[in-house]
């Protein structure tokens, strides 16, 4: 309906242009759903937008626009509201058509081709394989997976990718942590990984030969001097003593943790088309090649034995090291190579979803893209805020090194996948989130996911008791009470809500809409009877709630949440 209103407004503005009232008619005309039924179904601010250019006050211009609209059977009336809004009241016959459209299109209703098949590479989570995913990763996972689903629903082709940080010093710290647990030394570095999962991995390498010959007791003295230098010495000594067995331990640790991450994500309903290894960039020499390319372009200089990239030339606040004085490439060098590799795959758009703690990393990544002569606007970076998890009113701590973090798996086991997926995306991604476990587990109207699922289950219960209504000779005009009008108005909003959620990367908009729709249904359920003697009214009401049910299913599916038939 919005498209039709835009069309008739455009025709009216063209007439005013021909009459000399306007110099030119705009291409884009904004139409919004009204919040108050007394203000109509849709409203446009076009008169206020064009008032200054026309030399007319908004209400006068609005009247001229209305006078040129002509007759339209889809519109009951058009009114002007202060300070110049044009409000459209849609005819009841037009409004109720949405019910048949939803039922006929079923799971396809709401889908669009706005994206026209544009290809998007969406990278998200990409947590280091140094431990299980925690609840913070869970929010990024739920957000990323839902954004991907929404974009696909409006016509984009989306590939989900996980960047595996399986190279560098953190991997060595992981290997030494596992080995020290294997040899059961009493001394353990404070900056090693200490979770129970480290012990579990260590048990799996008990059969490897010669692993009982390792580091002298003197060299494992706890935190001797500088902690970072100490663990680096342990790593170097471990590599020397173990030889090829060191890589066996490292590979075992990475593969075990990565396998757990993959299982966790699949069970959470988060699927990836591609897993990209950082180590592959090292093995292929791409990181080295990129630094050489930047060097040849004059963007690299040497200082204090290290190689620095002049990112300040491209808007960054500081220059950045790409090769340390020991000759090792930094994570930033790998990230530059990775992003270049992404750009060369031919996607129309590249989206990274990062934790908000990576905010300072945006400028340097954008700088590297510009330096390599690519369009940095092709890359969008979305940030997700931290999660505060509360259990029994107490905030839980999350720290990978200490091993005391709450894992995503533990959260899912406690509240269930549906509650976790829904709660994670219920607030804007840029806002801090307080995850209330007690609320997520409650079976009450205050729990939004329960509230929505209960609406679906209630509809299923009614339909089980009723004979299947026939679309033949259906008369939807009998749906004329206030509750029915509100439900029909909400159903008419779904397409716009879906597109807005997708194009603005805002799943919470769809989640909040579903909660509102469920609320209107519950009110209708409490105040109305469905299995009435009047067949015409009975069938119309059943078709209305079938349409509501379909929208609840469609919306929940996009959010990665189930729609149970009973609760």
UniProtKB/Swiss-Prot annotation:
Keywords on record: Aminoacyl-tRNA synthetase, ATP-binding, Cytoplasm, Ligase, Nucleotide-binding, Protein biosynthesis
Quaternary structure (record): Monomer.
Enzyme class, UniProt record, top EC level: ligase
GO cellular component, as recorded: cytoplasm
Lineage start: Bacteria, Pseudomonadati, Pseudomonadota, Gammaproteobacteria, Candidatus Pseudothioglobaceae
Gene: argS
Main localization of the protein described in the UniProt heading: cytoplasm
Short motif 'HIGH' region, span: 127-137
Pfam families on file: Arg_tRNA_synt_N (PF03485), DALR_1 (PF05746), tRNA-synt_1d (PF00750)
PROSITE patterns: AA_TRNA_LIGASE_I
Identification of the protein by name: Arginine--tRNA ligase
GO molecular function, one term: ATP binding
Compartment list: Cytoplasm
Protein family per UniProt: Belongs to the class-I aminoacyl-tRNA synthetase family.
Enzyme Commission identifier(s): 6.1.1.19
């Amino acid at each position: 309906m919005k498209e039709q209103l835009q069309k008739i407004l455009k025709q009216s503005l063209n007439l005013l242009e021909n009459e000399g009232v306007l110099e030119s008619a705009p291409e884009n005309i904004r139409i919004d759903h009204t919040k108050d039924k007394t203000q109509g179904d849709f409203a446009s601010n076009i008169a206020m937008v064009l008032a200054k250019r026309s030399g007319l006050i908004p209400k006068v211009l609005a009247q001229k626009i209305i006078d040129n609209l002509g007759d339209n059977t889809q519109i009951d009336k058009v009114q002007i509201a202060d300070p110049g809004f044009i409000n459209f009241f849609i005819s009841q016959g037009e409004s109720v058509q949405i019910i048949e459209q939803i039922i006929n299109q079923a799971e396809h209703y709401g889908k669009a081709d706005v994206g026209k098949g544009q290809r998007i590479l969406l990278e998200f989570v990409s947590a280091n394989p140094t431990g299980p995913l925690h609840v913070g990763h869970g929010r990024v996972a739920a957000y990323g997976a839902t954004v991907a689903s929404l974009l696909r629903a409006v016509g984009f082709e989306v590939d989900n990718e996980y960047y595996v940080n399986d190279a560098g010093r953190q991997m060595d710290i992981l290997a030494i942590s596992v080995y020290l647990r294997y040899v059961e030394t009493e001394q353990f570095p404070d900056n090693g990984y200490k979770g129970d999962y480290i012990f579990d991995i260590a048990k799996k390498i008990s059969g490897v030969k010669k692993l009982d010959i390792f580091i002298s007791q003197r060299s494992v003295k706890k935190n001797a001097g500088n902690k970072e230098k100490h663990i680096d010495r342990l790593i170097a000594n471990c590599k020397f003593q173990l030889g090829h067995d060191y890589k066996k331990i490292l590979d075992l640790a990475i593969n075990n943790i990565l396998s757990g991450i993959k299982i966790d994500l699949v069970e959470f309903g988060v699927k990836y088309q591609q897993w990209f290894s950082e180590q592959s960039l090292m093995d292929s020499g791409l990181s080295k090649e990129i630094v050489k390319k930047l060097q040849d372009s004059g963007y690299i200089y040497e200082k204090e034995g290290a190689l620095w990239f002049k990112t300040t030339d491209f808007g960054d606040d500081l220059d950045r090291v790409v090769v340390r004085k020991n000759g090792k490439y930094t994570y930033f060098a790998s990230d530059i190579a990775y992003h270049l590799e992404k750009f060369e795959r031919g996607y129309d758009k590249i989206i990274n979803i990062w934790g908000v703690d990576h905010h300072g990393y945006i400028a340097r990544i954008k700088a590297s893209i510009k330096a390599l002569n690519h369009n940095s606007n092709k890359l969008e970076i979305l940030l997700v805020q931290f999660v505060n998890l509360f259990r029994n009113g107490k905030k839980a701590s999350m720290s990978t090194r200490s091993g005391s973090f709450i894992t995503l798996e533990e959260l899912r086991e406690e509240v269930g996948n549906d509650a976790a997926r829904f709660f994670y995306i219920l607030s804007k991604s840029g806002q801090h989130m307080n995850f209330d476990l007690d609320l997520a587990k409650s079976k009450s109207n205050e729990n939004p996911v329960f509230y929505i699922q209960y609406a679906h289950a209630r509809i299923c219960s009614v339909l089980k008791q009723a004979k299947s209504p026939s679309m033949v000779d259906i008369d939807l005009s009998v749906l004329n009470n206030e509750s029915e009008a509100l439900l029909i108005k909400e159903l008419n909003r779904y397409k716009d809500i879906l597109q807005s959620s997708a194009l603005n990367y805002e799943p919470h908009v769809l989640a909040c809409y579903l909660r509102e729709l469920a609320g209107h249904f519950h009110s209708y359920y409490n105040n109305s009877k469905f299995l009435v003697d009047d067949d015409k009214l009975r069938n119309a009401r059943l078709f209305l709630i079938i349409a509501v049910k379909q929208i609840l299913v469609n919306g929940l599916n996009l959010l990665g949440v189930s729609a149970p038939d009973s609760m």
